C-alpha cells in the first residue's frame, strides 16, 4: 500500500473520530464553538484529499493537497486549545493529535515527492 492509498483512509478515519468527538463535546461538555471549528477543519481534510484524486489538472491536485494541509494544521490548533483548556482529556488529545500529525507528514511527503 502506497502513501497515496493510505492518506485517504487515514483522513477518513480521522474525520470519523472528529465527528464522534464533536458529538461528545456538544452533548457531554456543552462546548459548541471550538468543537464546531474542529468539525469543519477535521472533516475537510479528507474531503479535499478525495477531491484531489479527481483533480482536473496537476495544479488542481496540488491546490487540494495544500488545502488539506492547511485544514490539518488548523485542526491541530483547535485540538491544542481543547486540551489546554482541559475540555479534552489528555489521552484523547494525544491520540487525535498524533493521527493528525501523521496525516500532515504524509501530505508533506506526497507534495514534496510529486514536485520532483
Regions found by a protein language model. Name each.
Residues 1-47, 51, 55-116:
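Short, C-terminally biased terminal segments at protein or domain edges
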Amino acid at each position: 500500500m502506497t502513501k497515496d492509498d493510505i492518506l485517504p483512509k487515514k483522513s477518513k478515519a480521522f474525520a470519523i473520530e472528529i465527528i464522534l468527538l464533536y458529538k461528545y463535546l456538544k452533548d457531554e461538555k456543552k462546548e459548541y464553538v471550538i468543537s464546531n471549528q474542529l468539525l469543519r477543519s477535521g472533516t475537510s481534510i479528507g474531503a479535499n484529499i478525495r477531491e484531489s484524486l479527481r483533480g482536473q489538472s496537476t495544479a488542481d491536485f496540488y491546490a487540494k493537497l495544500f488545502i488539506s494541509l492547511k485544514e490539518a494544521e488548523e485542526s491541530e490548533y483547535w485540538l491544542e486549545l481543547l486540551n489546554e483548556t482541559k475540555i479534552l482529556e489528555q489521552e484523547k488529545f494525544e491520540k487525535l493529535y498524533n493521527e493528525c500529525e501523521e496525516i500532515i507528514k504524509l501530505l508533506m511527503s506526497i507534495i514534496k515527492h510529486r514536485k520532483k
